[in-house]
């Protein structure tokens, strides 16, 4: 286990396990409390009503932090690899990081502004998180191909691009169907006119969310051979 998490591998590993736990625990508590229907609630539905709202908010906030830490570490890894063997313009890597961090900010917004309390802000945060997150995975997949075979195996590149493609394919109907729903609510009746839009949107939302989780899982091997150091200097003038 310790060998598996050598180097900086513990960062994406913690992100994956913590985020998975956040989704699952919030869902279980919300269902057992009778606050949501067990069949395909939105992820945000499982974090709207106390006590699950507190669990969801706390855990997703920390997931956003871990996501930012993982993305920044990945940025530094690619930067160092590119210095050793040039394969991509540094701007491409920087744009990817910027979009990823914006997505993490969106996660923070989702965690702190519940969908029934401030739906406009919540939905805006969700849009940032999902769209920027999907574009981030796509850009990182392209970078992986550019660095192949020096820094990534072709299999890893294919897996990352496959996850990115599925996420891209899911995020479009997720947004489209969600925009067609006329009311924000936690419980749905199959006979309601917007029910099909809710189901399609919820399926796509869960697909994209766990797509992110599986994508970051592919970073673990890359992070195993990496060490980050913080350098401290004291200025004698002060």
Swiss-Prot record:
Naturally occurring in which organism (per UniProt): Mus musculus (Mouse)
The places in or outside the cell where this protein is found are:
Lysosome membrane
Q: How does it sit in the membrane?
A: Multi-pass membrane protein
Query: Which residue ranges does UniProt annotate as crossing the membrane?
Result: 9-29, 53-73, 91-111, 116-136, 161-181, 200-220
Q: Give the function comment from the record.
A: Lysosomal modulator of autophagy that plays a central role in p53/TP53-mediated apoptosis. Not involved in p73/TP73-mediated autophagy.
Q: What GO CC terms are in its UniProt record?
A: lysosomal membrane
Q: Where does the signal sequence lie?
A: none
Full protein name? DNA damage-regulated autophagy modulator protein 1
The Gene Ontology biological process annotation of the record reads:
apoptotic process; autophagy; cellular response to oxygen-glucose deprivation; regulation of autophagy
What gene codes for this chain? Dram1
What's in the keyword line of the UniProt record?
A: Apoptosis, Autophagy, Lysosome, Membrane, Transmembrane, Transmembrane helix
Its family remark reads:
Belongs to the DRAM/TMEM150 family.
């Amino acid at each position: 286990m310790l060998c598996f998490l050598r180097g900086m591998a513990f960062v994406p590993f913690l992100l994956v396990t913590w985020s998975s736990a956040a989704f699952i625990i919030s869902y279980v508590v919300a269902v057992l409390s009778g606050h949501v229907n067990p069949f395909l609630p939105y992820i945000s539905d499982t974090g709207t009503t106390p006590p699950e709202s507190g669990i969801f908010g706390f855990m997703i906030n920390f997931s956003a932090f871990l996501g930012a830490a993982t993305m920044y570490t990945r940025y530094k890894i690619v930067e160092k690899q590119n210095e050793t063997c040039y394969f991509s313009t540094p701007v491409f890597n920087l744009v990817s990081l910027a979009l990823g961090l914006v997505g993490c900010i969106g996660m923070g917004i989702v965690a702190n502004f519940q969908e029934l309390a401030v739906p406009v802000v919540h939905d805006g945060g969700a849009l940032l998180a999902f769209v920027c997150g999907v574009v981030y995975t796509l850009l990182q997949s392209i970078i992986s191909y550019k660095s192949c075979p020096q820094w990534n195996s072709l299999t890893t590149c294919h897996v990352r691009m496959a996850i990115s493609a599925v996420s891209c394919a899911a995020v479009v109907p997720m947004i489209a169907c969600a925009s067609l729903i006329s009311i924000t609510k936690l419980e749905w009746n199959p006979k309601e006119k917007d029910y099909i839009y809710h189901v399609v949107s919820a399926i796509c939302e869960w697909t994209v969310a766990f797509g992110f989780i599986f994508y970051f899982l592919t970073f673990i091997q890359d992070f195993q051979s990496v060490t980050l150091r913080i350098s401290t200097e004291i200025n004698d003038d002060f």
